Amino acid sequence: MAGSTIINDTHARDGEQTAGVAFTLDEKIAIAQALDEAGVAELEIGIPAMGREERERIRAVASLGLKARLMVWCRMHDTDLKARSTAVAPSLSVPVSDIHITKKLNGSRAWALREIERKVKTARDHGLEVSLGGEDSSRADMDFLIAAATVAQRPRFRFADTLGVLDPFQHARLHLTAAATDPEIGYHAHTPRLANATAWVTLAAVLGGATHVNTTVNGLGERAGNAPLEEVVVSLKVLYGQDCGVDTRALGAISDLVERASNRPVAVNKSIVRDAVFTHEAGIHVDGLLTDRAPTRISTPPRWGASTASCWASIPARGGEDGLRQLGIACDDATAQACCRGSGRATRAKPPDGGGAARPFHDDACWQAFPAAGGV
């Protein structure tokens, strides 16, 4: 793993392919601007072949003057290349697994190589910087992938795990492709339907030689989704010391923006961007945090745009006192213990709004749940 990984966010393409998700033009513009301001290097902003309205939205985003490099997803069709906006680079997608080439395209490997060579040449003759995307790369023959990258004269090659069949330990397959494309290799992961592992597989791809990776905010995407932008960026920074140029303090606000625009609720304990990730109930954790935060934290919530809190329940009195201080209330041990007992009863009553122990101390809604549950 060398240098800094380039983040290519595809919320406006693969993210919007999530069943039931469609962004308005204003939402697309707001999200693109937020990602650009945060420092995301590349944005995939649509599919020209989807029609006139989609092309108008692409042109609108392209006209914003963003710092990010803009790309669009294109099939290996002359019509797709003609439909793209002049302000964006094409990412040419071609099926590369035998089952796709033969069953979907009724072609052969030799035919696919000829098409790749011809379309890439056409794009370059028009002065375009091309990225070649290999659909279903994870099920393709590695020698064929190298041949495809070679006939395309080694553009960036996007290795797409289209069906989410790779596990993190299979990333070594990328070493050969990385050597063949010299030096740029992109990686696009889809969440396996068996386990949510896209962020880890993407990190493994970086270790295997990927220089560019695809993400979507909140992991939006077809089927079980894509690698979440926030998880990949923060993991690269914390685990591997890689700064992708993204302002991590903006991640929480961007997540909120996309949550509203997509109408897809984000779990309260979603990694990185939700406060519950930094909320503690276990007595040993609360006690440790009040003594010294370092042993129970690899980072601090404000770095990711989140906040920290203790949580009501059967936590020790010391934690209860800390929580009440967050509410601006002074109390003794007995009062703190009584509050904790009341919170436990409120939580067991399963209030419809999820109050009680699930509420951090800084949310006074937990107090309202106490009377019905026989609280303090």
Curated annotation (Swiss-Prot):
Any single Pfam family the record assigns to this protein: HMGL-like
Superkingdom assignment: Bacteria
Domain Pyruvate carboxyltransferase residue range list: 5-252
Listed Gene3D superfamilies: Aldolase class I (3.20.20.70)
Transmembrane segments: none
Keywords: Nitrogen fixation, Transferase
E.C. no: 2.3.3.14
Function: This protein is a Fe-Mo-cofactor biosynthetic component.
Xref: PANTHER family: HOMOCITRATE SYNTHASE, ISOPROPYLMALATE_HOMOCITRATE_CITRAMALATE SYNTHASE FAMILY PROTEIN
Family named by the database record: Belongs to the alpha-IPM synthase/homocitrate synthase family.
Protein's name in the database: Homocitrate synthase
The organism of origin for this protein: Azospirillum brasilense
